[in-house]
């Protein structure tokens, strides 16, 4: 690796260790010419799969679009940004775990609904109403009835964030 101080090609690794999350390697390097030390980080380059829309068009996966959709559903809801970011990370990991170069937008939507159902019932219903294109109040009622029939412990876990805000 080229030295950022003098541009020499002769650098050596002095120390290597894993980052806290275990997804990066931190390396201390020393230049053979100027003896300066510097740190580099090495991580796997993971390419998110492309998203195939319902009309057949394809577009790159965009984390900011995922975040915007979730935040829109969670607007004015008592869910911490840390929990939202953790949900986004879980969705991205699940998409990568498919091992596919392309995924249907339907799969992304299902992953989002799954995460929102764990975060906040109101946000889940908001997202589901748009995602599944609810056309009448009965469709809302079906989803709400299903949520109400879940054991209280699941609902309590999802709503625990309300008191953390």
Swiss-Prot record:
Cofactor note: Binds 1 zinc ion.
Segments forming a coiled coil: none
Pfam families: ATP-cone, Zn_ribbon_NrdR
A single GO molecular function term of this UniProt record: DNA binding
Cofactor(s) the protein requires to work: Zn(2+)
Zinc fingers, unnamed class: 3-34
Domain named ATP-cone: residues: 49-139
Any GO BP annotation: negative regulation of DNA-templated transcription
Keywords assigned: ATP-binding, DNA-binding, Metal-binding, Nucleotide-binding, Repressor, Transcription, Transcription regulation, Zinc, Zinc-finger
Function in brief: Negatively regulates transcription of bacterial ribonucleotide reductase nrd genes and operons by binding to NrdR-boxes.
HAMAP family reported in the protein's UniProt record: NrdR
Family under the similarity heading: Belongs to the NrdR family.
Identification of the protein by name: Transcriptional repressor NrdR
Source organism per UniProt: Methylococcus capsulatus (strain ATCC 33009 / NCIMB 11132 / Bath)
């Amino acid at each position: 690796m080229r030295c950022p101080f003098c541009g020499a090609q002769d650098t050596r690794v002095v120390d290597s260790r894993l980052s806290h999350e275990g997804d990066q390697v931190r390396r201390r390097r020393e230049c053979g010419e100027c003896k300066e030390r510097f740190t580099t980080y090495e991580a796997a380059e993971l390419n998110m799969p492309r998203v195939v829309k319902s009309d057949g068009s394809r577009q790159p996966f965009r984390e900011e679009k995922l975040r915007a959709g979730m935040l829109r559903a969670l607007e004015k809801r008592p869910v911490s940004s840390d929990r939202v970011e953790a949900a986004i990370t879980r969705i991205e990991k699940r998409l990568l775990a498919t091992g596919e170069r392309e995924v249907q937008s339907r799969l992304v939507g299902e992953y989002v609904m799954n995460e929102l159902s764990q975060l906040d019932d109101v946000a889940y219903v908001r997202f589901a109403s748009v995602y599944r294109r609810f056309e009448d109040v009965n469709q809302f009622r079906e989803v709400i009835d299903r949520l109400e029939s879940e054991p209280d412990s699941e609902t309590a876990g999802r709503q625990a964030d309300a008191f953390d805000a």
